[in-house]
């Protein structure tokens, strides 16, 4: 398919090979009715991968929350265009807004999987983590992206401003909820399962 992306933070071309974790840890959901949530969808690269590779059962759906801020340029237009090209747009629910507010609309234990890759500010990450955990089903999985942002690639654009803020926030969340979760992967991304 001829999708349009200006950045590649997800595919095999990405130095962290994050798509490999998605393939490994989400395979249990393939061909099953699932509800997924993505916080921070940008142009839809990870959304499309999940639609085409995991959310293959007819009733599976994904909710995509993003502010699509002005600094992202035409990212929202590209997101909608890319999703339309999949032929699976009926499975995608677009929620344009701040995740800390939008997470409140979902009932407890609603999602099987939640991908957190939104605002990387420490306070925002903590809000996303706690809000996501509330709406995650028991046995469900959360993946936090950019855990080592500003640490493993200190010279990459924007990472100095982050100064490890995502790591601090995720570590705080993991400590507070340690009895209610299992860490299944911890590297550039952190993957947890709710007990």
Where are these regions (language model features)?
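A short alpha-helical cap/connector motif
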Residues: 1-195
């Amino acid at each position: 398919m001829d999708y349009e992306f200006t950045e590649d933070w997800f595919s095999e071309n990405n130095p962290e090979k994050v798509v490999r974790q998605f393939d490994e840890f989400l395979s249990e959901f393939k061909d099953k009715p699932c509800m997924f949530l993505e916080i921070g969808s940008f142009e839809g690269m990870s959304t499309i991968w999940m639609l085409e590779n995991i959310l293959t059962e007819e009733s599976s759906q994904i909710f995509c929350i993003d502010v699509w801020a002005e600094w992202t340029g035409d990212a929202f237009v590209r997101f909608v265009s890319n999703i339309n090209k999949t032929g699976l747009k009926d499975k995608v629910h677009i929620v344009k807004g701040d995740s800390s507010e939008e997470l409140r609309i979902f009932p407890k234990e609603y999602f099987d999987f939640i991908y957190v890759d939104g605002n990387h500010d420490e306070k925002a990450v903590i809000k996303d983590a706690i809000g996501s955990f509330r709406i995650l089903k028991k046995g469900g999985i959360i993946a936090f992206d950019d855990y080592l942002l500003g640490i493993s690639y200190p010279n990459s654009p924007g990472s100095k401003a982050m100064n490890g803020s995502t790591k601090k926030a995720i570590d705080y969340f993991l400590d507070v909820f340690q009895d209610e979760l299992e860490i299944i992967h911890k590297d550039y991304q952190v993957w947890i399962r709710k007990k």
